Amino acid sequence: MEAIKKKMQAMKLEKDNAIDRAEIAEQKARDANLRAEKSEEEVRGLQKKIQQIENELDQVQEQLSAANTKLEEKKKALQTAEGDVAALNRRIQLIEEDLERSEERLKIATAKLEEASQSADESERMRKMLEHRSITDEERMDGLENQLKEARMMAEDADRKYDEVARKLAMVEADLERAEERAETGESKIVELEEELRVVGNNLKSLEVSEEKAQQREEAHEQQIRIMTAKLKEAEARAEFAERSVQKLQKEVDRLEDELVHEKEKYKSISDELDQTFAELTGY
């Protein structure tokens, strides 16, 4: 009878221990489920972060499109400036040709003026010589005087033509100076446009490089999310298996916690790097 009591007490004690172990196992299973739910929440948070990154990438692509549009506008402005410069060059060439013709006419007028002056001088010398000789031939004197008048008229006409040519030459020179100033202004404008176009090209290249790096980081991030999702599914399977083997579950959950901490740190590092990249892109 005593042996039966001892056996019953032992069985009761074993029953109590079994109940305690079962309660501990249930508690560990609940903890594992909580950890699994927390992992799911973190995955959802990662998915939201990915969506945010995709939105920011769309903004970067819009900025790239705007930069391309601005570059096309600069190219059109450069083409317009080149057309203006070509027109100025043609205008300068016409002015130079007109100047050459004016100079040629001036040479002719100057030669005629010299010829008229020589004729006037010759007539004056002849008149003085006739006066000294006391020539009384009035008709001859009249003729000489008429020749003198004609010579003087020719000289005056040559003077007027010379003044007109000089005035036109001054106007042509003024037009030429203004055309040269416009040409210099056009060349300065071209230099400014070329410099601005070079700066835009450099910024565009930097933006394309930054976008390529962001794309590479995004792909790496997506790969990391897929890995984490697979590991989460594996953790859920292990949580189900933990209901049948509490001791194995505890070890697996501890390992998952360490791995999750490591993934959080890695994700934080990736997020910081992406934030820095987008900050640089926004700065451009």
Swiss-Prot record:
Keywords: Allergen, Coiled coil, Muscle protein, Repeat. GO terms for biological process: regulation of muscle contraction. It holds the Pfam family Tropomyosin. Signal peptide: none annotated. PANTHER family: TROPOMYOSIN (PTHR19269). Homodimer. Tropomyosin, in association with the troponin complex, plays a central role in the calcium dependent regulation of muscle contraction. Belongs to the tropomyosin family. This is Tropomyosin.
